[in-house]
Amino acid sequence: MFRKFAKNEVEPLAAELDRTHQFPYETFKKMADLGLTGLPIPEEWGGAGATYLDFAMFIEEIAKVCASTAVVMSVHTGLGCMSIYLYGSDRLKEKYLRPLAKGEIVGAYALTEPNAGSDAASLKCRAEDKGDHFIVNGSKIFITNGGIAQTYCTFVKTDPTAPPGKGITCLIIEKDTPGFTISKPVEKMGLH
């Protein structure tokens, strides 16, 4: 099924997506309709209940014909969904994981920073716990699905006194959160 889907639904659009730098909305919707956007997520949370090996084989088949679409899906499911599935409360799973796994919304993962790269131990982005919300200050870059996603699993330093690599929290930030801004995409080679 994965190979057939990749050949029939992904490959015909790959060159155009690469040329136009567009998100594969049409393909993402078809994946959602088939239960592929939440492949390794249990059915109780809106996923297909497949194994992570199944998910890896799916991504491999997509990557054979379109690396960009494979990255979109691996970030959405492997990072956006799995971060919440593995570490989120039932309340967070109900609110975010279920619509992510069903492909009703798109997920992103925000770790990389301008001055720290993807080194989580060197994060500069800070979040201050205000009891019922956090105040986040900092910047992230190179966010796959950035600008498209509705939720961002965002890694921040919540304890500035903690040693490097400690005192880090993953916050789910919604796209329409006041103060959350998305800059113009960076021009890069490949993986648009």
Where are the predicted features?
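Amphipathic, small/basic residue-rich leader segments at the start of a protein or domain
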Residues: M1-S74, R91-K95, P99-K102, V106
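Conserved protein kinase catalytic domain
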Residues: I59, C81-I84, L97, C153, ...
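N-terminal glycine-rich flavin-associated loop
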Residues: V71-R91, G117-A120
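Flexible, small-/acidic-enriched active-site or ligand-binding loops
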Residues: S122, D176-H192
